[in-house]
Amino acid sequence: MEGKNLTSISECFLLGFSEQLEEQKPLFGSFLFMYLVTVAGNLLIILVIITDTQLHTPMYFFLANLSLADACFVSTTVPKMLANIQIQSQAISYSGCLLQLYFFMLFVMLEAFLLAVMAYDCYVAICHPLHYILIMSPGLCIFLVSASWIMNALHSLLHTLLMNSLSFCANHEIPHFFCDINPLLSLSCTDPFTNELVIFITGGLTGLICVLCLIISYTNVFSTILKIPSAQGKRKAFSTCSSHLSVVSLFFGTSFCVDFSSPSTHSAQKDTVASVMYTVVTPMLNPFIYSLRNQEIKSSLRKLIWVRKIHSP
């Protein structure tokens, strides 16, 4: 079968959750609701952190960046899916597909890095509270966040350029609701060995760094918490990181099942469902997890609402 270079093909087709467009119509309302809740919730977290000077700390600086990443992450995939359902089309241009792939990989890895950075912040807060301000200086916080953005932008660009170098067969149907890397590789007519090798090396390395940071940080955190004599002290210390731990478990538990398995063993339906969990559900739940379990966020939300009530006509 003769392959065509990616740049010579005008479009491909996102099959979504079903090849029949009529079967996807009931999903429109659900995904629109989840998208609006996700964007509104994460932007509200950012607004609260910016407006309340008491939240101008390293922990909330990282949380604001995580909320920004979540809002951008869900905006990379869901709007195109909603537009396709609304206009009864499955088409996406190849340039649009590559652009979606770039931003998807950027924000999914950025979220992983930010969660690892927040785990380190939690470790310093619990294990070295007296030196917290000295260690988590503004310069270090800005460096960690900036490095996460820059490294993942370059990492995503590498994968996008490698994808652009492949040739594709006559079948341009992607069994997914967005342009993910593994479904695209499965359509290639040329040997994607280089792409898969880069995925294995860079994905494995970055994943290992993030996971090791999480494991080492939380091992020390739990060890320190267990040494606290009072039950109240243990609860207070654990509450500092419980929200973050919940988000970490949900995000990594679903994303690892999809991104670090061989393309030959992938089930399109299972991948699609799992991808919904970490591309839509997790970004939607993050603001609720952090706001419901965090007294400072709840207090700032109440103050923000109260101030707006006072100034409203």
Swiss-Prot record:
Lineage top rank: taxon: Eukaryota
Keywords attached to this entry: Cell membrane, Disulfide bond, G-protein coupled receptor, Glycoprotein, Membrane, Olfaction, Receptor, Sensory transduction, Transducer, Transmembrane, Transmembrane helix
GO molecular function terms noted in the UniProt entry: G protein-coupled olfactory receptor activity; olfactory receptor activity
Disulfide bond annotation, renumbered to this chain: 97-189
Subcellular localization, as worded in the UniProt entry: Cell membrane
One GO CC annotation: plasma membrane
Extracellular side: 1-25, 80-100, 159-196, 260-272
Membrane-traversing stretches: 26-49, 58-79, 101-120, 141-158, 197-219, 237-259, 273-292
Gene3D superfamilies, per the entry: Rhodopsin 7-helix transmembrane proteins
InterPro entries associated with the record: GPCR_Rhodpsn (IPR000276), GPCR_Rhodpsn_7TM (IPR017452), Olfact_rcpt (IPR000725)
Bilayer topology: Multi-pass membrane protein
Similarity remark: Belongs to the G-protein coupled receptor 1 family.
Protein name: Olfactory receptor 1G1
Lineage of origin: Eukaryota, Metazoa, Chordata, Craniata, Vertebrata
